[in-house]
Amino acid sequence: YNIDKFHHAVLADDQVVFCVAKNHPLAGREVVSIQDMAKQPLIFFNADSVQNQLLKLRFELEGYTPNIIMRSSQIYTTLQFLKTDRYACFLYSSMTDKFPEIIGIPMQTPIRVKIGMIWKKSRYISSDMQTLISFTKKYYQMHSLIPSDKKTSGD
């Protein structure tokens, strides 16, 4: 994509973490490697997610194939599998504090992700869409996941 043709707002800067239940064998680790994760039965988000593409590429670059046993777009379903202490998944670190029954373990080589919104510069933006954009920007300013000095906006 040619980013010059879009307005954009970065809302969050986060990292992907390896998530397991508190009693999972890897729960006590400070960090996990791709090699460690490749041995685990993994639940990935649906195939078209950016997170999946980044994870699959990381596994491939390090010469491993992830042991994907299921794909789901439902976090609740994924968490039910994790509670059995046999499975693992990947979430953004900012999400893990919302689920006290799981532990998010940083990856040895982190995958950082900027989360934001983009919209075409050349398109008409309805007042409802402008309201949504303004609301979202204000919300993330008040509930920031990134320091205010690192926020960028390409309005």
Predicted regions located by residue number:
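Short beta-strand-to-loop elements that line the ligand-binding cleft
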Residues: 65-74
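Thr-Gly-centered strand-to-loop micro-motif
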Residues: 21, 45-46, 91-92
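Generic preference for hydrophobic
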Residues: 8, 18-19, 42, 68, ...
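Beta-alpha-beta core module
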Residues: 2-15, 76-122
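Ligand-binding cleft/hinge of the Venus flytrap
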Residues: 52-65
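A late-sequence structural motif
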Residues: 105-146
